[in-house]
């Protein structure tokens, strides 16, 4: 009886973690397939399994980026997309997707969340970290569009500072 109970517990454990025997590449392919079928939660689960089970694999950073991209482009949850892109920048700072993630953070703040100060901060951080990157012209374009907004922000801050000093 005890052996049957142990066997049942083991089988339940295996069925709950169906991704445990899959390679990072298999999980990546599953995540991509689920996404193409619009099974977004399954896709995210596959990508999270890569991050959890293969944290040092090159696909871990790409999986984190894909999660952020799903929230940005598929679910349109822009705040959560920013959080997920921030994880890429924090956890994988040297990976190729980190700089694109930093750009996307600024882009989302500017174009979707209307958090212009945050957009300016992140665009300037991008310029500082990647001064010769191919995205610099896009960063400059976005910052140019934010100049008037920045002037308004500065003016409002000046008014607030004057009132608090009275």
Which residue ranges define each predicted feature?
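Acidic, polar-rich low-complexity tracts and alpha-helical solenoid repeat scaffolds
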Residues: 4-7, 16-166
């Amino acid at each position: 009886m005890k052996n049957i109970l142990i066997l049942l517990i083991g089988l339940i454990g295996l069925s709950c973690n169906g991704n445990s025997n899959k390679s990072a590449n298999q999980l990546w392919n599953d995540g991509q397939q689920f996404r193409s079928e619009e099974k977004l939660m399954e896709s995210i689960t596959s990508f999270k399994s890569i991050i959890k089970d293969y944290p040092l694999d090159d696909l871990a950073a790409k999986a984190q980026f894909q999660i952020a991209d799903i929230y940005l482009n598929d679910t349109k949850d822009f705040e959560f997309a920013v959080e997920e892109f921030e994880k890429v920048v924090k956890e994988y700072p040297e990976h190729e997707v980190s700089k694109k993630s930093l750009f996307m953070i600024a882009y989302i703040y500017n174009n979707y969340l209307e958090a212009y100060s945050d957009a300016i901060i992140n665009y300037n951080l991008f310029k500082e970290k990647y001064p010769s990157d191919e995205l610099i012209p896009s960063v400059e374009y976005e910052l140019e569009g934010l100049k008037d907004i920045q002037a308004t922000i500065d003016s409002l801050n000046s008014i607030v500072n004057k009132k608090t000093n009275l």
